[in-house]
Amino acid sequence: MPYWLPTYNFEGLQCLQCKKALGSLDALKCKNHKYRRVHRGGKPYGMCQICLEALLQLERQEFPWTLLLPKDFVKVLGRLPGDYCVRCYYCGCVLSDSEKDRHALDHEGYLYVRGRARGRCYSCSSDGRRPCVF
């Protein structure tokens, strides 16, 4: 059974980290990447792309991670990759089924960090700017 993530309207929200108002592009990315709004003090917040990528970089560098091979996905997480929400470890978008298939075909592993699997989306892996971290 595929996962389901709700979509929210992020127009007019502030970034949780820098407290700047989200621009229309950041609000659209939050919605398209299926982020969830967070509430602090009863007020909803989103996340701008600059802060999100900085936090994902911090997660890759500061938190211990292990390599999770596609063949071991079910053993570790108990579900197939198609039934699991895997996000990109560079930009945070949800990986599509074809991107998860690319991981399996190319034998590119996932990062298993903080109890979650992270992979690379097509946009972050196609141009070579964002290399595989292992």
Swiss-Prot record:
Protein name as annotated: Protein E6
Family classification: Belongs to the papillomaviridae E6 protein family.
KW Cell wall biogenesis/degradation (keyword) present: no
SUPFAM superfamilies in alphabetical order: E6 C-terminal domain-like (SSF161229)
Subcellular location: Host cytoplasm; Host nucleus
GO terms (BP aspect): DNA-templated transcription; regulation of DNA-templated transcription; symbiont-mediated perturbation of host apoptosis; symbiont-mediated perturbation of host ubiquitin-like protein modification; symbiont-mediated suppression of host innate immune response; symbiont-mediated suppression of host type I interferon-mediated signaling pathway
One of the record's GO molecular function terms: DNA binding
Chief location bin: host cell
This protein's UniProt keywords: Activator, DNA-binding, Early protein, Host cytoplasm, Host nucleus, Host-virus interaction, Inhibition of host innate immune response by virus, Metal-binding, Modulation of host cell apoptosis by virus, Transcription, Transcription regulation, Viral immunoevasion, Zinc, Zinc-finger
Top-level taxon of the source organism: Viruses
GO cellular component: host cell cytoplasm; host cell nucleus
Function text: Plays a major role in the induction and maintenance of cellular transformation. E6 associates with host UBE3A/E6-AP ubiquitin-protein ligase and modulates its activity. Protects host keratinocytes from apoptosis by mediating the degradation of host BAK1. May also inhibit host immune response.
Transcription regulation is among the record's keywords: yes
Quaternary data: Forms homodimers. Interacts with ubiquitin-protein ligase UBE3A/E6-AP; this interaction stimulates UBE3A ubiquitin activity. Interacts with host BAK1.
Coiled-coil annotated residue ranges, if any: none
Pfam families: E6
InterPro entries associated with the record: E6, E6_sf
Zinc finger (unnamed): 15-51, 88-124
